[in-house]
Amino acid sequence: MDLDYNSKDLCIDMYYKNCGLKKPEINLQKECEFKPYFYVDTSEPKEIYDYLDGLNQEIDLKKLEPEFENNTSLKVQDLITNIEIIEKIVYSDYILNGKDISEVSDFKNKKERKICKVYVKYPNHVKIIREYFKEFGKSYEFDIPFLRRYMIDQDIVPSAKYSEDNKIDNSIPELNCIAFDMELYCKKEPNAKKDPIIMVNLFSKDYQKVITYKKFENSEYNGCVDYVKDEKELIQKTIEILKQYDVIYTYNGDNFDFPYLKKRANIYEIELDFDNASNSQQPQIIKISKGGINRKSKIPGIIHIDLYPIARKLLNLTKYKLENVVQELFKINKEAVDYGDIPKMWETEDTTLLRYAYEDALYTYKMGNYFLPLEIMFSRIVNQPLYDTSRMNSSQMVEFLLLKRSFEQNMISPNRPSSSSYRERAKFSYEGGYVREPLKGIQEDIVSLDFMSLYPSILISHNISPETVIYEEKERENMELGIIPKTLNELLSRRKHIKMLLKDKIQKNEFDEEYSRLEHEQKSIKVLANSHYGYLAFPMARWYSDKCAEMVTGLGRKYIQETIEKAEEFGFKVIYADTDGFYAKWDYDKLQKGKKEENDKSDKLSNLPKLSKEELIILTKKFLKGINEELPEGMELEFEGHFKRGLFVTKKKYALIEDDGHIVVKGLEVVRRDWSNIAKDTQQAVIRALLEDGDVNLAKKIIKNTIDNLKKGNIDKNDLLIHTQLTKNIEEYKSTAPHIEVAKKIKQRGDSVRVGDVISYIIVKGSRSISERAELLEYAGDYDINYYIDNQVLPPVIRIMESLGISEDELKNSGKQFKLDQFM
């Protein structure tokens, strides 16, 4: 389940769940034989010792473990416990990586060579000693964290069930999970020195409670409350409950909940000891570490899964507050409460606070259960603990998968770039995927075609990898696959096999536990496979290659453009294309007249015989069969779906309606907070009118009615509120803006505002600047009609309507009636 390094006894603590007992329990097993190491590029250990003797440098004792504190003359070589000569393939020999091509070894004739493996006593000694080796020559794999190194070398599959004879059960293990959240009493920015925890919210299969020390009368949630005496008892009870679980879900628990809990516990001299291992008296103290701008909160023996980085990794949202993620995943509008409002709710015994606290834990639990199976599959594929992979971005997961594959091939991995190399890499830019300007306006009877995993397929079929990219195409075809295409080939072959198994289960109507496991596995493989191309272009990557990235996008453009050309020869008219897919309709004009007439709208499609949806799909699949026979092995164009109607505005901005009425919007969404409800609602209504009914006049009427209602004062002021977040202190803003002026007014009235607050305001009538006319709802007089027409209602819809040939002036004033076929 979990790994931790115990510096006291120089062992790796391995926590696992013994499921063979009547009541499963957590056990601790110690691994003391595995030692830290790194590689030095020499075949003679004596050279290393001679070099270090020549340095005659003493170690900075502050960097070492306590046992060395009294040693006043410790030398670098004293930290080395052993050096052995081994034979390895050194990957860096075969890649450019800043070298001249004449210095690159021939990968076609790759071979192992002798190199020194240097062992040390403590994991942190690796980086210390490596610093002294910079003048000596190349050293490798000095920056792989010790516990992750252990997982790679020992080939341990995490998050899996092992039988007594060491066989792996592929089913997703049953883990006892609980969600943890808390509420504070703070009127300003939370301050752990003075602001108490007033509620802890916990939700699991068998325990759903808000723990607090204040009585709330007449609440429907009273049955979900556990009362304690005070904050000290609340913290103690929280620890006692949490330590009973295998997995703890939080939402931003790394950066907030656990660090705050620890600071409050320190005030009461409570140690956050989550001792849950039945066969050990060893304390399991929470460890809070810092990496970059973020912290990590690790509990030995319990898997802490912070769902915030997972949501950022797997969801494409504008905001990542808990409420936004709940809406995205479960289509539920979860109530939001600003933490500055909680003190008043607490003092007045507002039972809304109980509901809010309870739902925080409930939806964190639901979200955790939603993501857990997928994260378990990531953990297994990458061969790293669940705690670690849940905090990795896609590129980091790809890198550890490649480190694993490199070890399996007896290969020493390349190093990460130095600071100067990183800066050079970050300057590199190249042409991206092919994007074709759309046929603007409304289109009907549309098919969507996409390449299945285009970039991964190109990497495999063209054998593109940092060690192969220096060879010509024909040479690469006859070579052994490089590490990138080889890894991808294994992943995609596995996914193809899984999809066949899933198809079989669907036909047999077997939607069982195995179906769920396979579905999560194929999703995780898809994410990892599609991340390899991005990884190659990531400046911090070990296997970085700008040449590979450039070659892949170039071939991607070639394949999509050639496929579009063949689709149009077949009888389609391509409406829009982007990177790895395109939308098309049947080209009736070309079919009947033998040529395209894109600019001649006199002969309308309604006068020509139309294909039925079924006939169009049959033709589409016939085209796919032919094109896929011509494509390289492993590359496949797929039918993604049929759309009743589509609205195309410009590149990256379009909307479509599926046959079942579901609307897909890309790039047109009004999602920023600084759009009022009236702006969002108007745009959504316009898109729906155009897609559901194909009714341009209705869309125009919706806009005109909104403008008329604004002019008549018939709009609820709540729908005019604009919401903008303060991203820094008021004094730090060099220029003014509406939300800054409102924040100043709030302070002048005696209330507090702080960084992170969302300021909601209305723009009122007047002759002063827009910023000066921004007011809170309760102080707002008549709103500025022209401001809302010109800056809120029209901007989100004007580009849509202009793509249909309707001007801004026509929207503001009464205009002629339109027919749909004028815009096709």
Curated annotation (Swiss-Prot):
Coiled coil: none annotated. It catalyses: DNA(n) + a 2'-deoxyribonucleoside 5'-triphosphate = DNA(n+1) + diphosphate. GO terms for biological process: DNA-templated DNA replication. It is an enzyme of class 2 (transferase). GO terms for molecular function: DNA binding; DNA-directed DNA polymerase activity; nucleotide binding. Its EC number is 2.7.7.7. Keywords: DNA replication, DNA-binding, DNA-directed DNA polymerase, Nucleotidyltransferase, Transferase. PANTHER family: DNA POLYMERASE CATALYTIC SUBUNIT, DNA POLYMERASE DELTA CATALYTIC SUBUNIT. Belongs to the DNA polymerase type-B family. This is DNA polymerase. It comes from Methanococcus voltae.
